[in-house]
Every structure is written in structure tokens, then in C-alpha cells.
């Protein structure tokens, strides 16, 4: 089974109320909504990356070998061979980092970014070096439901189903969604980093 309904799932119980995060300290947190990710980022003095920032980091250190990332291995969806030892998430050091030292920018879990989703975001951005993304969401498939962007693909991605592990691939989901293959990473601006260093030194 690759989709299954579970009750009382949350970040402490990612696969249902009988599950736990024991032994998963070095795995990405999952079952977090976009709102959860933003709340944690703000608490930590960081932020979610913009879509442009995320893609820049992914492209700078692009991983082109699909065996160097945690994606579905086998015939999707009937057989997940798990030949790398992971049927779901992997610890962050299970695969080598990309060329700029970032782990799991492809595969493992989808990652929330700050931006609203629109299918024509890049056309709207023109030639901006660091576009901030659209001011509102529009998904022509579900125009009444606001969506945020997720990037990077997950352990459910496979060339037969989802090629979201490509650095340019985009997906979207409603910001109140939490699911077992979506997490997030935080970024720091130079200003945020300066505040962090001052806190450590004082």
C-alpha cells in the first residue's frame, strides 16, 4: 500500500497513533502543515526559503543520479523494493550531500517553501534574480483552494509516477495539509545569522 488512511497522525506519530519518532531523530520531521513549518521557523529565528532560493540551492548542487537519492525503488505502486534500506524517510546523512553541502535536496520528503502557488510564477517573475513569488494563489485545477509550493520530491517519487525529484519540478498543496512525505528546511538571512551568532556569544 502506498496510500493509507490513518487517524491521529502528527509529527510525533507520523504513521498513525501507534507510531512514534523514537529512533528518527536524524530523519526529517513530517506530518507538518505549512503553518506548522512557518511557526517553527519563526520560533527558531529563521524562515522558510522562497521557491527561488530553494531552486537555486538545488540547481547549484544538482544530483543527477537517481540512485543517490531516496525515491521509490521498484515498480510503482505495486512493489517498493527498498533496496537502499529505506521504505520511507532516511536519516539526513544516508546519502552524500550535493555539491554545495546540502543533504536530500532531491527525494526523501517534499519540502514546504514560502511561496504561494501559481502555474505561471516564472513568467510573472520575469528576469528577477531573486523573485519573491506571487501575492496570492491560483490553481486552475482547484481555483477555490489556496495552495503553497512544495519542492524536491519524496520517497514516493518514481519515473513511473512522479518525477518531482528534478530541481525544476514543482508541486502544490493546501497549506493546512500534513502528510507523511512532506517536511521542510529552514534558511537564515545574513541578518538572522548575525542575531544567532550574537545570542551564542552573549
Which residues fall in each region the model found?
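Functional-site microenvironments in short loops/helix caps that host divalent-cation chemistry
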Residues: 1-167, 171, 175, 180, ...
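Short, structured beta-strand segments at or near domain termini in extracellular proteins/domains
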Residues: 180-195
Amino acid at each position: 500500500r502506498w496510500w493509507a488512511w490513518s487517524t491521529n497522525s502528527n509529527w510525533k506519530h507520523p504513521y498513525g497513533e501507534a507510531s512514534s519518532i523514537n529512533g528518527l531523530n536524524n530523519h526529517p520531521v513530517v506530518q507538518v502543515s505549512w503553518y506548522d513549518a512557518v511557526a517553527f521557523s519563526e520560533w527558531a529565528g529563521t524562515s522558510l526559503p522562497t521557491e527561488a532560493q530553494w531552486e537555486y540551492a538545488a540547481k547549484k548542487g544538482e544530483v543527477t543520479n537517481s540512485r543517490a537519492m531516496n525515491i521509490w525503488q521498484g515498480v510503482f505502486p505495486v512493489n517498493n523494493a527498498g533496496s537502499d534500506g529505506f521504505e520511507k524517510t532516511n536519516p539526513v546523512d544516508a546519502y552524500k550531500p550535493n555539491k554545495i553541502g546540502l543533504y536530500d535536496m532531491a527525494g526523501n520528503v517534499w519540502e514546504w517553501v514560502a511561496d504561494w502557488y501559481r502555474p505561471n510564477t516564472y513568467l510573472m517573475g520575469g528576469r528577477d534574480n531573486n523573485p519573491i513569488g506571487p501575492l496570492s494563489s491560483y490553481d486552475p485545477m482547484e481555483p477555490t483552494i489556496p495552495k503553497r509550493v512544495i519542492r524536491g520530491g519524496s520517497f514516493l517519487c518514481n519515473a513511473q509516477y512522479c518525477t518531482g525529484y528534478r530541481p525544476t519540478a514543482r508541486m502544490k498543496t493546501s497549506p493546512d495539509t500534513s502528510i507523511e512525505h512532506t517536511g521542510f528546511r529552514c534558511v537564515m538571512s545574513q541578518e538572522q545569522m548575525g542575531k544567532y551568532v550574537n545570542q551564542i556569544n552573549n
